[in-house]
């Protein structure tokens, strides 16, 4: 965290450009290493930008609860340190919450990938790029469908 406080001005300006909401994904692979780093990252981001909304999606709340006394591993949603903490595995809850308020900025920590429910939300609207071609605008209406 000390290194983050001493970031050059350029990096601090990047923090200012962040949206007001960041969704942080953490798939716990080892017991405490990855969730420990993600916890410190979220804490540092909160300190850098006071009104930042952090939504932390964690695959193993038991591990998180062991390193932080404020986490209840039995709750699939909770508020902690001003963050919204979600259980990665509660598909219905997460899909409902993130459908109402889609993520603006997503951090996939340690290349964890995205949960299936988030993939569905992000890629639910698709269009076929094969149809888009360099055709003059006045001829587009004449293209057969």
Residue ranges and their predicted role:
Residues 2-11:
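Cationic, amphipathic, low-complexity segments that mediate targeting or membrane/lipid association
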Residues 2-3, 18, 99:
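Residue-level detector of alpha-helix boundary/anchor positions
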Residues 19-23:
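Extreme N-terminal starter segment of soluble prokaryotic enzymes
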Residues 25-49, 55-145:
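Active-site and donor-binding regions of nucleotide-sugar-utilizing enzymes
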């Amino acid at each position: 965290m000390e290194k983050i406080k001493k970031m050059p001005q350029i990096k601090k300006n990047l923090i200012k450009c962040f949206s007001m909401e960041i969704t942080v994904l953490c798939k716990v692979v080892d017991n405490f290493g990855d969730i420990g780093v993600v916890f410190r990252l979220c804490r540092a981001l909160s300190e850098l930008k006071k009104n930042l909304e952090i939504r932390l999606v964690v695959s193993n709340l038991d591990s998180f609860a062991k390193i932080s006394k404020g986490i209840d591993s039995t709750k699939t949603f909770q508020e902690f340190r001003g963050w919204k903490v979600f259980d990665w595995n509660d598909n219905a809850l997460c899909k409902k919450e993130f459908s109402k308020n889609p993520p603006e900025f997503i951090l996939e920590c340690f290349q964890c990938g995205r949960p299936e429910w988030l993939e569905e939300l992000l890629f639910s609207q698709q269009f076929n790029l094969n149809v888009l071609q360099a055709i003059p605008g006045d001829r587009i209406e004449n293209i057969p469908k």
